[in-house]
Amino acid sequence: MHEISLVQGLFQQLADLARQNKMTRVVTVTMQIGPLSGVVADSFRFGFEILSAEDDLVRGADLIINTTAVTYRCSKCGAGIESTAERPESCAECDEIFLLAEGGDELILEKVEME
């Protein structure tokens, strides 16, 4: 489960931000995680909960995960199909099965609220 190491990296980033801004506690962390990022949101949340219990800066902080959409572009007609879940079987416009993914691979620290 590589999400644990991602959360550890996030906590280091939060510690750096807290130090730079002279803050002592993280209240809320908002992440943007794309469905093609390779990150399982539930595992990331689990890692956050487990590791935050051991970290004074992040203990009790809320984690908000926003899932970004992927646009699947048809290679034949160019139509775009947005999805946050599974890849569509085919283009809704022309029934082509070769669809190219655009975006959806984000793993972004979007917002942090600190005290």
Question: Model regions: which residues?
Answer:
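Short hydrophobic/aromatic patches at helix-to-coil boundaries
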Residues: 111-115
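Short cysteine-rich clusters marking metal-coordination/redox-active sites
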Residues: 74-77, 91-94
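Immediate flanking context of iron-sulfur cluster ligation sites
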Residues: 64-72, 82-84
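Cys/His-rich microdomains that often coordinate metals
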Residues: 80-81, 98
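Short Cys/His-rich "knuckle" micro-motifs
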Residues: 84-87, 101-105
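Long, charged N-terminal interaction/targeting segments
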Residues: 1-61, 66
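Intrinsically disordered, low-complexity, mixed-charge
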Residues: 1, 78-79
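Cys/His-enriched microdomains
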Residues: 72, 89, 107
